[in-house]
Amino acid sequence: MAPTTRIPTETEIDVEPAPGETAGDVDIAAAAALMADPSRAAVLAELTDGRALPPSELAEVAGVSRSTISEHLAKLQHAGFLTVEKGGRNRYFRLAGPEIAAAVESLAALAPRFPVRSLKQSRRAGALGAARTCYGHLAGRLGVGITEAMLARGLIDREGEVFLLTDAGATWLEHLGIANPPRAGKACNDWSERRPHLAGRLGVALTGRLFELAWLQRTQRTREVRVTPQGEVGLSHELSLKVAPA
């Protein structure tokens, strides 16, 4: 008996407006207006590393009072930019998701830089430009440098806005101690270097392992990271990267 040929069924798509539909096009201006306030912009930028911080620390970052920061945080939470977590009697705020961090980083790549007016600001800007975290992955000169070294060694390939892990890259990451590494990551445009660094699940996995190996160390500021002496040796041996001492 001859096998029967299966005829694909039609898929019906309703392109008529839904009854009672009230939502129109996206209001980009409303989202931009929330980020246009310098204090709220400072809060969002400080939280791009993915961690949760209390209002007291965010008030210091934004340079405003506790009562004022509460108003800003309420607006950002209401708009869906932030989520709040409770720890005992305290509240901690974090970005609602990686898409918020990506939006902040994308705007930062287009934004002018603040003029540096003090030694403290100069050191802060230098540290952020050298190495920082963005929602769990590395950014700055270190993040871009590691990404470009991996590309040069055939550990990853770039296809559009995606970095794909090669077989050689998977073997290398397993050698570093990452079992079953993610096979892809995003190409995130670095606002300070104007070149892409490795983001997404692959970037987060690699960054997390570098912290576990004590090659990286967090500073008192949440986003800034420094390379340890072990990290200098490890990055030189594995990727031929020479990292200047902090």
Where are each of the predicted segments found?
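Short, Lys/Arg-enriched C-terminal cap helix and immediately downstream tail that follows
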Residues: 40, 55, 80-82, 88-89, ...
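N-terminal helix-turn-helix DNA-binding core of bacterial DNA-binding proteins
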Residues: 26-65, 91-93, 126, 133-134
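Basic, amphipathic "hinge/linker" alpha-helix immediately C-terminal to the N-terminal HTH DNA-binding motif
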Residues: 85-110, 165, 169-172, 231
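Canonical helix-turn-helix DNA-binding module
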Residues: 55-82
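Amphipathic alpha-helical dimerization/coiled-coil segments
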Residues: 2-27, 49, 101-158, 176-221, ...
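Beta-hairpin "wing" of winged helix-turn-helix
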Residues: 77-87, 91-94, 159-160, 219-220
